[in-house]
Swiss-Prot record:
<feature type="binding site">
    <location>
        <position position="56"/>
    </location>
    <ligand>
        <name>S-adenosyl-L-methionine</name>
    </ligand>
</feature>
<dbReference type="InterPro" id="IPR023397">
    <property type="entry name" value="SAM-dep_MeTrfase_MraW_recog"/>
</dbReference>
<keyword id="KW-0963">Cytoplasm</keyword>
<feature type="binding site">
    <location>
        <begin position="37"/>
        <end position="39"/>
    </location>
    <ligand>
        <name>S-adenosyl-L-methionine</name>
    </ligand>
</feature>
<feature type="binding site">
    <location>
        <position position="113"/>
    </location>
    <ligand>
        <name>S-adenosyl-L-methionine</name>
    </ligand>
</feature>
<dbReference type="InterPro" id="IPR002903">
    <property type="entry name" value="RsmH"/>
</dbReference>
<comment type="similarity">
    <text>Belongs to the methyltransferase superfamily. RsmH family.</text>
</comment>
<dbReference type="Pfam" id="PF01795">
    <property type="entry name" value="Methyltransf_5"/>
</dbReference>
<keyword id="KW-0698">rRNA processing</keyword>
<feature type="binding site">
    <location>
        <position position="85"/>
    </location>
    <ligand>
        <name>S-adenosyl-L-methionine</name>
    </ligand>
</feature>
<dbReference type="GO" id="GO:0005737">
    <property type="term" value="C:cytoplasm"/>
</dbReference>
<protein>
    <recommendedName>
        <fullName>Ribosomal RNA small subunit methyltransferase H</fullName>
        <ecNumber>2.1.1.199</ecNumber>
    </recommendedName>
</protein>
<keyword id="KW-0808">Transferase</keyword>
<comment type="function">
    <text>Specifically methylates the N4 position of cytidine in position 1402 (C1402) of 16S rRNA.</text>
</comment>
<keyword id="KW-0949">S-adenosyl-L-methionine</keyword>
<dbReference type="GO" id="GO:0070475">
    <property type="term" value="P:rRNA base methylation"/>
</dbReference>
<keyword id="KW-0489">Methyltransferase</keyword>
Length: 317
């Protein structure tokens, strides 16, 4: 058997995410975030004559999956799609797929992307500022940090990083780049630290975490892509089909919760004796409170601490 590519990635909420889809052995399923292929592999174990379509825009994820899922690929049980999941509907349509039985999302950055210092995601490892999930796109963290005006940086840091020192950090960046371009992750992390009061530096967690998150979200338009994709997924689902979404920070969770609430709520006009079928909510929430990782999982998978799983079921087209 071929050796797998170095793509160490502990799958979060593995069983919960797939099991709550109530997989039909002959169904059509989508893993919108292939990553390390953990969810795909487990979902495939539940299929007999069904088929799985797995999306990822990261080339390394695809190379890893070609090895990890080699048997299922040979049996034509899975199709790997190199694309941003915001093109979910059109990519599936090209393959003749217009309806699916279930879909899962594991949002956020895969561990290997953080671990590969050359990708420029980590504030702990020296690398050129990059943060592109799709290596073919032009916008990178370097352009955001060096070219965006002060006001745009403040907006991004506050909106996507929820950092109360957004103005101070943006000002420090603006001053530094007038002297020379800010080129590396450590250079940026040190700048962020220099903009913060001493008491902030003593708090738990890395002081650059929120700002790096904000820049990453901007570079990859993560929230915009997630919103577009989840909306498309709901439309693609067959009646009784399910959608599972794992989020890792409050912005992703709020977005998912808002979309699910919008599709699962009906404002019934007063005096209406019976609700017509076409006025029923499109979705039914399977869990009102998010599913969290078990104590057992938290012991071996640090990434699971912030993970939240929300699941919904399609009730009507």
């Amino acid at each position: 058997m071929p050796k797998t590519i170095a793509f160490k990635h502990d799958t979060v909420l593995l069983h919960e995410t797939v099991d709550m889809l109530e997989v039909k052995p002959n169904g059509i399923y989508v893993d919108a975030t292939l990553g390390g292929a953990g969810h795909s592999e487990y979902l495939l174990s539940k299929l007999t004559n069904g088929h799985l379509y797995s999306f990822d825009q990261d080339e390394t994820a695809h190379e890893n999956a070609k090895v990890r899922l080699s048997e299922q690929l040979a049996e034509d049980k899975v199709t790997l799609i190199k694309s941003n999941f915001r093109y979910l509907k059109s990519a599936l349509a090209e393959l003749g797929v217009t309806k699916i039985d279930g879909i899962l999302y594991d949002l956020g950055v895969s561990s290997p992307q953080f671990d590969d210092s050359q990708r420029g995601f980590s504030y702990k490892k020296e690398a050129r500022l990059d943060m592109r999930m799709d290596q073919n796109q032009t916008l990178s963290a370097y352009e955001v940090v060096n070219d965006y005006p002060y006001e745009a940086l403040v907006r991004i840091f506050f909106r996507y990083g929820e950092d109360k020192f957004s103005k101070q950090i943006a000002r420090k960046i603006e001053q530094a780049r007038k002297i020379k371009p800010i080129e590396t992750t450590i250079e940026l992390a040190d700048l962020i630290k220099s903009a913060l009061p001493q008491k902030e530096l003593k708090k738990k967690g890395h002081p650059a975490k929120r700002i790096f998150q904000a820049i990453r979200i901007e570079v990859n338009d993560e929230l915009g892509a997630a919103e577009e994709s989840i909306e498309q997924a709901i439309d693609l689902l067959k009646v009784d089909g399910r959608i599972s979404v794992i989020t890792f920070h409050s912005l992703e969770d709020r977005l998912t919760k808002t979309i699910f609430k919008e599709y699962s709520t009906v404002n019934v006009p007063k005096g209406l004796p019976m609700l017509p079928k076409d006025m029923e909510a499109k979705l039914k929430l399977i869990n009102r409170k998010p599913v969290l990782a078990s104590e057992e999982e938290l012991e071996f998978n640090n990434r699971a601490h912030s993970a939240k799983l929300r699941v919904a079921q399609k009730q009507r087209d």
